[in-house]
UniProtKB/Swiss-Prot annotation:
Substrate binds at residues 125-126, 162. Mg(2+) binds at residues 11, 13, 188. It is an enzyme of class 3 (hydrolase). The gene is UTR4. Pathway: Amino-acid biosynthesis; L-methionine biosynthesis via salvage pathway; L-methionine from S-methyl-5-thio-alpha-D-ribose 1-phosphate: step 3/6; Amino-acid biosynthesis; L-methionine biosynthesis via salvage pathway; L-methionine from S-methyl-5-thio-alpha-D-ribose 1-phosphate: step 4/6. PANTHER family: ENOLASE-PHOSPHATASE E1. GO terms for biological process: L-methionine salvage from methylthioadenosine. It comes from the Eukaryota. This is Enolase-phosphatase E1. It comes from Pyricularia oryzae (strain 70-15 / ATCC MYA-4617 / FGSC 8958). Bifunctional enzyme that catalyzes the enolization of 2,3-diketo-5-methylthiopentyl-1-phosphate (DK-MTP-1-P) into the intermediate 2-hydroxy-3-keto-5-methylthiopentenyl-1-phosphate (HK-MTPenyl-1-P), which is then dephosphorylated to form the acireductone 1,2-dihydroxy-3-keto-5-methylthiopentene (DHK-MTPene).
């Protein structure tokens, strides 16, 4: 383990679960659920907050909103209002048992070990905080609900973009009891790792099965791990 780590700050996609879960399960599920949701809940006050978060030109009609969502997903645009809507759509899938998050086998045991050692676990993902809580609340692990192990959740709304140094500085400022050099951020995204390092965090690149090959030179510049067992 890296020296003096008091906080593990974890990415989700490609770090604790396969990239394919997000791309091949979650995104298609939301797109499939969207038309019925728009037809049945367009004027529902519970849905209105998600609809009205979209730019006005897209929130004006079901057709415009649906087309905009499909466009954003196809281009993998991480717009906060899209992430919030996706979380809302995924909730039904998680609640019904249709969706379970397939965590890598080392994740849940490490969560338990880190908790027992008094090390805080926090999450930082481009997915919305509600969507993060749904994912960790409905996993294939034992126990299936790991949310109680997680001290805090961060996304692009409450922290900022994951490739910006200021976002990590903001996260650290929310937990001033932990000096920046006691944080270890783990992500499959090299640009995110660079930003965390720039903020004074420790940070490693995670290379999981199904992740794209790392660019040349990454393993020369960064510590790369392939399992949390290496920590």
């Amino acid at each position: 383990m890296a020296s003096a780590v008091k906080v593990f700050l974890l990415d989700i996609e490609g770090t604790v679960c396969p990239i394919s879960f997000v791309k091949d399960v979650l995104f298609p599920y939301a797109l499939e659920a969207l038309p019925h949701t728009l037809d049945s809940q367009w004027d529902d006050p519970a849905f209105a907050q998600y609809r009205d978060a979209f730019p006005a030109e897209y929130a004006s009609s079901k057709e415009a909103l649906a087309a905009h969502v499909r466009d954003l997903v196809s281009r993998d645009v991480k717009a906060p209002y899209l992430k919030s809507l996706q979380g809302y759509l995924w909730k039904n899938g998680y609640d019904s048992g249709e969706i379970r998050a397939p965590l890598f086998a080392d994740v849940a045991p490490k969560f338990a070990a880190w908790q027992a050692a008094g090390i805080a676990i926090m999450i930082y993902s481009s997915g919305s905080v509600p969507a993060q809580k749904l994912l960790f609340g409905h996993t294939n692990s034992e126990p299936a609900d790991l949310t109680s192990a997680i001290a805090d959740f961060f996304d692009t709304v409450n922290a900022g973009p994951k490739t910006e140094i200021a976002s990590y500085e903001k996260i650290a400022s929310m937990h001033p009891q932990y000096p920046k050099n006691e944080w270890l951020f783990l992500s499959d995204n090299v640009k995110e790792v660079d930003a965390a390092l720039g903020a004074g965090f420790q940070s490693f690149v995670v290379q999981r099965p199904g992740n794209p090959e790392l660019p040349d030179g990454v393993e020369d510049r960064h510590k790369v791990i392939r399992s949390f067992e290496e920590l």
